[in-house]
Regions:
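Short coil turns that delineate tetratricopeptide repeat
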Residues: 312-313, 347-348, 381, 415-416
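Structural motif corresponding to the intra-repeat A-B loop/turn of tetratricopeptide repeats
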Residues: 287, 291-294, 329, 363, ...
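Primarily the internal scaffold of c-type cytochrome electron-transfer domains
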Residues: 1-7, 11-18, 22-26, 37-42, ...
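Conserved structural position within tetratricopeptide repeats
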Residues: 305, 309, 340-344, 374-378, ...
Length: 434
């Protein structure tokens, strides 16, 4: 393994460096539990080394990891740990001339800019949408996060906890809501030191507002707050892990009273006004498709279609999202026109080449579809789904030789793929009877 992710306090993940790609190990190590399936993997018959760790994955686990424009090919020399600049901004001038005036101090920012620093990594939400022409690395501490990307939330009563939902939980806390912006992550978390007495330090924050406690609810000797008001809960997306419940409930088992919003997305940080319909539409299409909510996906499509033509034509992400949605709803000819336009604007985008191939196939342009599948593979040979679709095309046409060649090409890139090896063996001629 080339890299280890995590300090080991909760666990560790592992990354291999294969060619131009970083690949996540399907096995992870958990403190107190040992080895098990890594986050995001499901225990199954085949656990392959084929999950590419891209820019989105590493943004919060490594410092300024360098990738190509696709965000998948690793172009840096090595990964390094998160540095001071992630929270304090560019520091070259501060190193030369140390001064409080040339470095960002989160505690001195307004609440929105201050909380944006924490939320860039500790708020996952349902969808993260980049504004046009922006990438994750464009965010700078001191800015409002929504100038770079917007995190949309989908709130439901009893929703499973995720490992990076602390900021979302905290925002729902009545303590935060009534503090006027004074209570924030930094009130309890000091990233510059190790706690010597965690419960006592947190209690000091609590009693700064709750000086008088009910004797009936707080018997003598029960002086610490966390065990009852912020108990540990198990996140759904990571095995053998526990995070603190940041809703700060009055008592164990209490659920905050909230309106059911399962089919609506919202954000606490709106993007610039000119991007609001665009960003929400992209988020609704994405979440509606991945969570199986047709009404949400349809609402997202309507929002994007309502954008001025000039905006749609100049925004490949919008064109591709509309094309994908129309492809899934049987509007193949409209999808083809849209994805062709997106692919022309970004000819190096492997995903657009792939969706163009799918659209061509749905329009019975099989030869053109084959060429685009091959082109998508040339652009990004790490995408297993590209090979699977091309193999499916060859199976339907009875082209066993081309099928074997395509499987061999994937195995040349990833020789450890159990699934592809299994399929390749099935294509071997039967052994002669003895």
């Amino acid at each position: 393994m080339a890299y280890q992710i995590g300090s080991g306090k909760a666990g560790r993940g592992y990354i291999a460096h294969i060619g131009d790609y970083l690949i996540q190990s399907p096995a992870g190590w958990y403190n107190g539990q040992g080895w098990d399936v890594a986050p995001g993997f499901v225990a199954s018959r085949f656990l392959d080394f084929d999950r590419v760790i891209d820019n989105d994955c590493l943004y919060c686990h490594a410092n300024a990891a360098q990738f190509d424009e696709s965000g998948r090919r690793f172009t840096g020399s090595a990964l390094t740990a998160i540095s001071c600049e992630r929270c304090h901004g560019p520091s070259a001038e501060h190193v030369k001339h140390p001064s409080a005036k040339n470095i960002v101090n989160p505690a001195r920012l307004n609440a929105s800019a201050r909380d944006s620093i924490c939320e860039q990594c500790h708020l996952e939400g349902a969808a993260r949408i980049l504004n046009p022409g922006r990438n994750l690395q464009d965010y700078r501490p001191g800015d409002d996060l929504a100038r770079t990307f917007v995190i949309y939330l989908r709130e439901r009563n009893g929703e499973s906890v995720k490992a990076v939902s602390q900021a979302e939980q905290l925002a729902k806390s009545r303590c935060v809501q009534k503090s006027g912006g004074k209570l924030w992550c930094g009130s309890c978390h000091n990233p510059h030191s190790q706690r010597t007495d965690r419960h006592r330090e947190v209690r000091e924050v609590c009693v700064s507002c709750h000086a008088k406690l009910s004797p009936a609810a707080h018997p003598k000797g029960q002086w610490e707050c966390v065990s009852c008001h912020m108990p540990g809960v198990s996140p759904q997306d990571i095995l053998h892990a526990a995070i603190t419940d940041h809703r700060i409930l009055r008592y164990r088992g209490e659920e905050e009273i909230e309106q059911e919003n399962g089919d609506r997305l919202f954000t606490s940080r709106e993007p610039p006004a000119r991007f609001r319909k665009r960003d929400l539409g992209l988020a609704e299409l994405k979440v509606g498709a991945q969570d199986g909510i047709p009404a949400m996906a349809e609402a997202g499509m309507r929002l994007l279609e309502s954008l001025p033509d000039i905006e749609k034509q100049n925004d490949p992400a919008v064109l591709a999202a509309l094309a994908t949605a129309k492809l899934q709803t049987g509007m193949a000819s409209e999808a083809l026109a849209l994805i062709r336009e997106a692919a022309e604007k970004q000819p190096r985008n492997a995903s657009y080449a792939f969706y163009l191939a799918l659209a061509l196939g749905k329009n019975n342009e099989i030869a053109a579809a084959e060429r685009q599948f091959r082109r998508a593979i040339d652009l990004d040979p790490s995408r297993k789904e590209f090979f699977i679709e091309l193999c499916t095309l060859y199976i339907r046409q009875g082209r066993a030789g081309d099928l074997a060649e395509t499987i061999d090409r994937y195995l040349n890139w990833n020789p450890n793929s159990i699934g592809f090896r299994f399929q390749r063996v099935r294509l071997l001629p039967p052994e002669p009877e003895k």
